[in-house]
């Protein structure tokens, strides 16, 4: 949120490293759901606070502030929990493929969140690039949800680099960084 895309490099990378390092401790698939839900709740709690400000103008609506502040992020976090629940069924042996699976699952559940129950397409991770108009020009070609998957993959590069096991993973990081620089320049 807040158009500071650099924050996503830290949050996604640290979260992905946490999941990979806790793989042996997270024996139950529900634990992945729990951590995904907590990640989503924190994200939506921090980025949807502004809804409560709209409820302060009328005295009768102030009673809805706790509902808007807690229940909306709680509900939306279920989608991230479901994404990580499905992620838990994949074998944890190659970090590059896991990062791509992680990105695709998050992207799919962002799409579902944006279209189910009349949709809630707010706060996609790609929106953190909204101040970089040059970067988001590709939206006219591939669409918001596709760029969202690419951005999540891009945000996981530091995690892949930290967790690297082979030279091919370093090569993957370099290629993806070059693609990102290309998009930022052109």
What are these regions (language model features)?
Residues 1-186:
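Membrane-embedded alpha-helical bundles of multi-pass enzymes
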């Amino acid at each position: 949120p807040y158009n500071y895309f650099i924050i996503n490099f830290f949050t996604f990378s640290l979260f992905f490293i946490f999941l990979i390092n806790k793989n042996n401790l997270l024996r139950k698939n529900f634990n992945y759901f729990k951590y995904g839900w907590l990640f989503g709740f924190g994200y939506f709690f921090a980025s949807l606070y502004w809804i409560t400000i709209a409820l302060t103008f009328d005295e009768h609506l102030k009673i809805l502030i706790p509902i808007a502040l807690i229940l909306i992020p709680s509900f939306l976090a279920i989608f991230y929990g479901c994404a990580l629940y499905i992620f838990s069924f994949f074998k944890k042996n190659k970090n590059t493929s896991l990062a791509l699976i992680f990105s695709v699952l998050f992207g799919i559940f962002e799409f579902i969140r944006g279209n189910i129950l009349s949709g809630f397409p707010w706060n996609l991770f790609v929106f953190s690039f909204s101040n970089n108009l040059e970067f988001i020009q590709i939206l006219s070609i591939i669409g918001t949800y596709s760029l969202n998957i690419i951005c999540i993959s891009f945000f996981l590069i530091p995690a892949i680099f930290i967790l690297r096991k082979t030279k091919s993973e370093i090569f993957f990081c370099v290629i993806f960084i070059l693609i990102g620089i290309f998009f930022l320049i052109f």
